[in-house]
Swiss-Prot record:
It comes from the Eukaryota. It is a single-pass type I membrane protein. Its main location: membrane. One of its GO terms (biological process) is regulation of blood pressure. GO terms for molecular function: chloride ion binding; natriuretic peptide receptor activity; peptide binding; peptide hormone binding; protein homodimerization activity. GO terms for cellular component: plasma membrane; protein-containing complex. It is linked to Defects in Npr3 are the cause of a number of skeletal-overgrowth phenotypes, Longjohn (Lgj), Longjohn-2J (Lgj-2J) and Strigosus (Stri). These are all recessive conditions characterized by an elongated body, thoracic kyphosis, arachnodactyly, and sacral and/or tail kinks, but no significant changes in craniofacial structures. This is Atrial natriuretic peptide receptor 3. Belongs to the ANF receptor family. Has low affinity for peptide hormones in the absence of bound chloride.
Amino acid sequence: MRSLLLFTFSACVLLARVLLAGGASSGAGDTRPGSRRRAREALAAQKIEVLVLLPRDDSYLFSLARVRPAIEYALRSVEGNGTGRKLLPPGTRFQVAYEDSDCGNRALFSLVDRVAAARGAKPDLILGPVCEYAAAPVARLASHWDLPMLSAGALAAGFQHKDTEYSHLTRVAPAYAKMGEMMLALFRHHHWSRAALVYSDDKLERNCYFTLEGVHEVFQEEGLHTSAYNFDETKDLDLDDIVRYIQGSERVVIMCASGDTIRRIMLAVHRHGMTSGDYAFFNIELFNSSSYGDGSWRRGDKHDSEAKQAYSSLQTVTLLRTVKPEFEKFSMEVKSSVEKQGLNEEDYVNMFVEGFHDAILLYVLALHEVLRAGYSKKDGGKIIQQTWNRTFEGIAGQVSIDANGDRYGDFSVVAMTDTEAGTQEVIGDYFGKEGRFQMRSNVKYPWGPLKLRLDETRIVEHTNSSPCKSSGGLEESAVTGIVVGALLGAGLLMAFYFFRKKYRITIERRNQQEESNIGKHRELREDSIRSHFSVA
């Protein structure tokens, strides 16, 4: 009996030790395959309310009709058998509301009205707006309300100040300042220090203005000189004035305008003999969209041959394009959805479409880490901090966000490599995270290895299509003008001399007559006064 009691006591002690050991190992972090799954299942299913603020007007490249298919594609991925099932608690669902932001205060009003209608209930995530003037007040309110805000817009330089009013903003598309960093690396590669900025500014969206503002600020910080010329391409374009400005400013010209306007400018400078290697022209293709000048010279008109020659001096800066099978599938689905909306165009997938898709993936990654750390979806500041300073796989390749919550920009430079056929290829790439620009070694440049090493201080003699003589002296018309001008000047001097002489004689005679008359009138007045006083 005593042995039975000892055996029972020993078994109890052994069982207690096993249980304690299990608890200790669990508290230290169980790394067995099923442990993470059980921890994730312990979290409650999440209902994520997303407010998308984008314009309904399809004239914008980031309209709801264009971007919504990309957002829904990403949501199907994270809610289905993709990223979301691995990262979020089972049963998590996204409830998305789409509101018209326009490009002004409507975005702010939509946010405030929605919160008021929900009796103070705020969304868990804001996607958009894109336009600077729409994004600014929404970003300030998001910071005040502790709401994470992810946008493929708000690209102007002012939004990089995240310490106060824009603290809850993450930009998932390269900001304009990133374009400036790319141009700076390009200039350092070619040993240039001066640039002329020529751009269209309609005073509304002002995309080109904000783009070259970013270039200007980066250049200014690094001691590079810039001068600027702006025009409104929606009105009559004074090409002669643009050419005169370029001739009187810098040798390296950075342009931003629509594709048709860039073509007109290049034709104009070509006709003035400015595409023979004395200038370097760069065109910025914004947003991976051909509407902002993709470097295409062909229009099927009578100017094609001339434009092909002109474009041999033009290089186009565009976002680096990567192709992977998933991106092709994504592009086809977006194209199908957009066409159902009645939109038929070439650029179904631009920078904004890609950016908002990747914004969903980035938010899910950040939310996963916040929930795992014991916080909730309402901890907007914690979530937004998890979106910064990280790299993840986007729909078109790797996406890297810097420590300030801004996406690094990877860019390519496209130029004409076959002047006979007019073929254009990528000749160089810039990798934003490394800050590195490199020319491609397998490309034949039509200008040779030293053509772009411009002498920025040398004065250029400009020619145009009209015949002219350059004999070193004055032309016949100039001499004739000088002689005629001298004769006219002499005639005017003689006429003035004789007029002045005649006028002086006339004045002297008139003065003599007036003095005689004044003497008579004085005597009469004095006699009248004396007679009056005598009578008095």
